[in-house]
Amino acid sequence: MAKTLYDKVWQAHIIDQIGEDSLIYIDRHLIHEVTSPQAFAGLNEKGRKVRRPDRTVGTMDHSISTRSLAIDACGPANALQLQTLAKNCEEHNIQLFPVGHQKQGIVHVMGPELGLIQPGMTVVCGDSHTATHGAFGALAFGIGTSQVEHVLATQTLKQSRAKSMLINVNGKLPVGITAKDIILAIIGKIGHAGATGHVIEYAGEAIRGLSMEERMTVCNMSIEAGAKAGLVAPDEKTFAYLEGREYAPKGQDWEDAVAYWKTLYTEEGAKFDTVVELEAADIAPQVTWGTNPGQVIGVNTPVPAPEDFSDPIEKESAVKALEYMGLKPGEKLADIPVNHVFIGSCTNGRIEDMRAAAQVAKRGKVADSVTAIVVPGSGAVKRQAEAEGLDKIFTDAGFEWRLPGCSMCLGMNDDKLVAGDRCASTSNRNFEGRQGRGARTHLVSPAMAAAAAITGRFADVRDYQE
């Protein structure tokens, strides 16, 4: 029977069947300071060791300051998390990239750029956006703290097989439309729970045309559609991206790896539980208006009314979202003022994102009413951006250029908003209070965020691109 990409990766990692569940082997385990302390504590209490420290890599990202390299810059609680991670990694001989290390970065940015993630792998992390790594044709998903402990101890995980979903994005992307617009449009179409219980495979001409960094953006937000994971089949772009990276295979091992990677595709006639079709030509620059990523519209579309939704749950959700966001049905996004802009995160903190935002930023100055920060996703991204002069473009335009970290994506460090603030953000979640209690978050692409910084409102980025 014809197999999907998901079938192939899943079946290659089954160790044993436990009733209806499978015990699968984990190839790569990424850890950070927030979800690992309790896991290591459990390990130590039971007198266990980390089974495969060589397959485990740690970084500091969530709780760190983007203003200072001091480990205690975000207060004693955050400092304790960071110190605990360092202690645990040292005791268990795990490679750690701490604050200030040249390879440190957001876990889902530094992992790929080091070549730690490769096609056909199983990848887990105590973080919901682990799906990012599916861009390489890896089965990657977030896990809870108890599961982190289990993987540390056994390098395995008990899992039930998910359903499969194929999402085809047909045709070429129009000028000015980005990977962020693709994934927001997908979530807008199927809903923020539309892929619950599924692993998504993204395909179609528009997806094949994306760079590896753009594919990471798409896969990153699979969880916002409710999915377990998101995948893109590896191709020549994947191989070119990985070749020569620090942890990628070398010599004959590389040749053997590529030969295997080329078998990782969905075979003709393979069956999916669900198939979704989108036309790339229909996608406009996207902006979320509500409090979940599925509440999203094109930048020139009026804010919807609750009556526009037939589902009673969606209707009630719209009522609450409009109230929280301080919006009225029929309003134009171009009339809505923004006072904060955040460019960064594991969704859009890579070098191509920095370049896209800088292209818009150089066309103006940050509006007097706006505070705008740019946070590179890793030390490598920061150095590359500075080598290209992007930092100067940003600072000359009035943006703040920060140190790498998760930053304003979540209210877990010192980059927070206050009640009533309205932020154009390149992150992945617009939940109530995500960026600070009472703060209002609108998800957009890096270019759209830069345009919002300049205009002080939501503007169609296509008007600001050459």
UniProtKB/Swiss-Prot annotation:
GO terms for biological process: L-leucine biosynthetic process. This is 3-isopropylmalate dehydratase large subunit. The keyword Magnesium does not apply. Gene3D superfamilies: Aconitase, domain 3 (3.30.499.10). Its EC number is 4.2.1.33. The keyword Iron-sulfur applies. Keywords: 4Fe-4S, Amino-acid biosynthesis, Branched-chain amino acid biosynthesis, Iron, Iron-sulfur, Leucine biosynthesis, Lyase, Metal-binding. PROSITE patterns: ACONITASE_1, ACONITASE_2. InterPro entries: 3-IsopropMal_deHydase_lsu, Acnase/IPM_dHydase_lsu_aba_1/3, Acoase/IPM_deHydtase_lsu_aba, Aconitase_4Fe-4S_BS, Aconitase_4Fe-4S_dom, IPM_dehydratase_rel_enz, IPMI_cat. It comes from the Bacteria. It holds the Pfam family Aconitase. CDD domains: IPMI. It catalyses: (2R,3S)-3-isopropylmalate = (2S)-2-isopropylmalate.
